[in-house]
């Protein structure tokens, strides 16, 4: 138990000697420096240096008399003080590193992401940084894993629009159900995800290969613009189909199958990106 407490105090930036002295005072106080050394096992040659460090840091109080006596800050107060100090440090770091944000958001690079979980984690981070609009193409199987972040963004006033492959229901997003979800899944033999945030960054890739899934994240305008516009073009098409499906299917077949086949390069009319 004592060893565990020593480790905990070390995690709170106590040295080993400081930890032993503080624990000794928690068990019994007030004590003289000599008594603290005897009770804690800290060498007498080091004890006053250790106690002075604790006093300066505010973890121990000292009464200045003929024989100084030491008492510890109560454990609850110590934890509260450490938590407040840590929050101050985080606030300072956040303000300091803000000026490097633009450098970190390098608009010239394209970054590869490997693994389905890693791809979805990046998408979550992008979602939470969006300020105005999110455009997303996603399968039902993957939607649930980022739904909480999407809802949080929507509650912050971000407009969320989803092209859904599969039956996705949402009370916070504009959802366009793709009528050909099953056909497309079979045709491609896989699932992709395309995210665009604020017309300034995109994540796009295949998410159906588990650890072998691949995606790219970028703020490069040469990719952000066309990928975002492809999503918007799909939305245009879905709005047109909603109003003129009968007319269009009369010309191009059910679910526009003739168009899909017209622009296929394979005799089986399937996609072979994953081969």
From Swiss-Prot:
Keywords for the protein's UniProt record, in alphabetical order: Coiled coil
Pfam family for this entry, one: TrmB
Gene3D superfamilies in the record: Endonuclease Chain A, Winged helix-like DNA-binding domain superfamily/Winged helix DNA-binding domain
Repressor listed as a keyword: no
Coiled-coil residue spans: 75-157
Disulfide bonds: none
InterPro entries reported in the protein's UniProt record: TrmB-like, Tscrpt_reg_TrmB_C, Tscrpt_reg_TrmB_N, WH-like_DNA-bd_sf, WH_DNA-bd_sf
Entry superkingdom: Bacteria
Protein name: Uncharacterized protein YrhO
């Amino acid at each position: 138990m004592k060893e565990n407490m020593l480790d905990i105090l070390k995690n709170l930036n106590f040295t080993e000697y400081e930890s032993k002295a503080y624990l000794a005072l928690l068990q019994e106080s007030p004590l003289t420096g000599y008594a603290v050394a005897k009770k804690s096992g800290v060498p007498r040659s080091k004890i006053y240096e250790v106690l002075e460090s604790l006093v300066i840091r505010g973890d121990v109080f000292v009464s200045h008399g003929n024989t100084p006596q030491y008492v510890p800050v109560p454990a609850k107060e110590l934890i509260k003080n450490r938590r407040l100090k840590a929050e101050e440090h985080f606030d300072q770091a956040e303000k300091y590193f803000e000026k490097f944000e633009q450098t970190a958001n390098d608009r010239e690079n394209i970054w590869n992401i490997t693994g389905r979980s890693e791809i979805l984690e990046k998408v979550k981070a992008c979602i939470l940084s969006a300020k105005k609009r999110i455009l997303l193409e996603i399968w039902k199987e993957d939607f649930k894993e980022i739904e909480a972040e999407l809802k949080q963004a929507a509650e912050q006033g971000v407009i969320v629009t989803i092209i859904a492959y599969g039956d996705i229901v949402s009370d916070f997003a504009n959802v366009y159900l793709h009528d050909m979800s099953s056909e497309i899944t079979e045709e491609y033999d896989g699932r992709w995800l395309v995210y665009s945030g604020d017309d300034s960054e995109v994540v796009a890739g295949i998410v159906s290969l588990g650890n072998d899934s691949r995606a790219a994240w970028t703020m490069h305008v040469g990719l952000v613009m066309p990928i975002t516009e492809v999503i918007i073009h799909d939305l245009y098409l879905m709005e047109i189909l909603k109003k003129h499906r009968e007319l269009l299917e009369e010309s191009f077949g059910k679910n526009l199958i003739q168009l899909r086949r017209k622009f296929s390069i394979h005799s089986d009319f399937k996609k072979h990106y994953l081969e």
